[in-house]
Amino acid sequence: MDTLIKEFDVALRAIAGATRTARANPADRLAPDTEQMSADERRHVAGLMRINHVGEVCAQALYQAQKLTARDGAVRAQMDAAAREEEDHLAWCAERLRELGSRPSLLNPLWYAGAFAIGWMAGRAGDRVSLGFVAETERQVEHHLGGHLDRLPEADGRSRAILEQMRDDEIRHGNAARDAGGIPLPAPVRALMRGASRVMTTAAYRI
């Protein structure tokens, strides 16, 4: 029962944006920069950061489901450690959205539920498949973050600092999953993941 209560609390905090951070925000070392951007640039950056916030909501759901279904204690601990770092990402993105005068996606409950279901299925397929799913997810997220870094206005150093740290963390999580025995996913599964990501990013940019 205690475990269920704890995991329910994790879900509520992820959806509501009431997450805790263990690490300082990488943007804290930089001066405020929103006034150096035009209104259109701020709206564009807010759309990108909303996408990244949704991605971190989904990461919380995926890791939570995969942790609950993991057979091996070491895999469970690895999922838990990665989820805590992803919680930092979630809080950093939420803070940047507030600075930009924007808000998270209104569809966060839907994103969370869908990601949890996918993570549960991956976890039920076995630890090596689950770790392979983590590795592929992080590879796609790394690519996606690189694209966002290329699309940021030159004046937006604070978002850049956040996304660069997130990308470094995602690379490390993916490498750890492969090193722990994650197996490559079939090409159709990878393509399906990319398709689902495109749907999410298109909707989250605006809603």
Swiss-Prot record:
Its main location: membrane. InterPro entries: COQ7_proteobact, Ferritin-like, Ferritin-like_SF, Ubq_synth_Coq7. Fe cation 2 binds at E86, E138, E170, H173. It is a peripheral membrane protein. GO terms for molecular function: 3-demethoxyubiquinol 3-hydroxylase activity; metal ion binding. GO terms for biological process: ubiquinone biosynthetic process. PANTHER family: 5-DEMETHOXYUBIQUINONE HYDROXYLASE, MITOCHONDRIAL, COENZYME Q10 BIOSYNTHESIS PROTEIN 7. This is 3-demethoxyubiquinol 3-hydroxylase. The lineage of its organism: Bacteria, Pseudomonadati, Pseudomonadota, Betaproteobacteria, Burkholderiales.
